[in-house]
From Swiss-Prot:
One of its GO terms (cellular component) is cytoplasm. This is 3-methyl-2-oxobutanoate hydroxymethyltransferase. Catalyzes the reversible reaction in which hydroxymethyl group from 5,10-methylenetetrahydrofolate is transferred onto alpha-ketoisovalerate to form ketopantoate. NCBIfam families: panB (TIGR00222), PRK00311.1 (NF001452). HAMAP family: PanB. The gene is panB. Keywords: Cytoplasm, Magnesium, Metal-binding, Pantothenate biosynthesis, Transferase. The keyword Magnesium applies. It catalyses: 3-methyl-2-oxobutanoate + (6R)-5,10-methylene-5,6,7,8-tetrahydrofolate + H2O = 2-dehydropantoate + (6S)-5,6,7,8-tetrahydrofolate. Pfam families: Pantoate_transf. Its cofactor is Mg(2+). Homodecamer; pentamer of dimers. It comes from the Bacteria.
Length: 277
């Protein structure tokens, strides 16, 4: 075995995530949208990298996830997959299917799922929705494409909700979410993201399923957690939701570095003789 191969870690698979749930090991997941960040996060030991349609917000500046296209998702996914491959190769890469790429018909959903998988070599896809997309999930998983579900607050349905408030706080909606989770599991999903739901409900869903749950604003009882990388790094001063823990203030760090650069250029302090040819 060559040195490069020795440095590669065992790649995280759907089977590994299932084993982690059964062994009580928590699953760590963050979003990634580019090559450099993917390498850093894979090196840091993340189990899963999500190429989220949240790129529409944090990368392109849109107010919702709806505008991003399949072609744009493929662009980001290719970069992330290359990053993981060029680092340890350990992290699983999951890609969001964007709005209206799987809702029109089962045939179109299957065609788009195949397109996304073939064009960048990711490990799995993520779809939002409950029983209304169960047949689609089954069709996609039946051809061998792993699917991660997403329930609770579903950003692709933001205009239906009218806000980003906590979902399933009332009895009827909570019961429906629990039912949807079981239906999506039966349809073949290997895991389900639970977003902004009461922690008590998330715990109940987690206990009721044999597949892992990944929480975002859903409490500590979930089998794992996911956050947007920009949020934990403090890159957006205007966005401070309750469920995000900020681990760094890169907004300030980057701004300070840029200001220093501007000053050095204006004062002819950069480049120095050592930085010139």
């Amino acid at each position: 075995m060559n040195k490069s191969a020795q440095q590669k870690s065992a790649h995280v698979t759907t089977r590994r995530l299932l084993d982690m749930k059964h062994n009580g090991e928590k699953i760590s997941m963050l979003t990634a949208y580019d090559y450099t960040m993917a390498r850093i996060l894979d090196r840091a030991g993340l189990d899963v990298l999500l190429v989220g349609d949240s790129a529409s917000n944090v990368f392109a500046g849109h107010s919702t996830t709806l505008p991003i296209t399949i072609e744009e998702m493929v662009y980001h996914a290719k970069a992330v997959v290359r990053g993981v491959h060029d680092e340890s190769g350990r992290a699983m890469v999951v890609v969001d299917m964007p709005f209206m790429s799987y809702q029109i018909s089962g045939d179109e959903a299957l065609r788009n799922a195949g397109k996304i998988m073939k064009e960048h070599g990711c490990d799995a896809l993520k779809l939002e929705g409950g029983k209304i997309i169960a047949d689609t999930v089954k069709r996609i998983t039946d051809v061998g494409i792993p699917v991660m579900g997403h329930l609770g607050l579903m950003p692709q349905s933001i205009y239906k909700y009218g806000s980003y408030k906590v979902r399933a706080k009332e009895g009827v909606e909570a019961e429906q979410l629990l039912e949807d989770a079981k239906i999506i599991e039966e349809a073949g999903a290997f895991a389900i993201v639970l977003e902004k739901i009461p922690s008590v409900l998330a715990a109940e869903v987690t206990r009721s399923l044999t597949i892992p749950t990944i929480g975002i604003g859903a409490g500590v009882a979930c089998d794992g957690q996911v956050l947007v990388i920009n949020d934990i790094l403090g890159l957006n001063r205007e966005f401070h939701p309750r469920f995000v823990r900020q681990y760094a203030d890169l907004n300030t760090v980057i701004e300070h570095a840029a200001k220093q650069y501007v000053e050095d250029v204006r004062q002819s302090n950069f480049p120095s003789p050592d930085e010139s040819y």
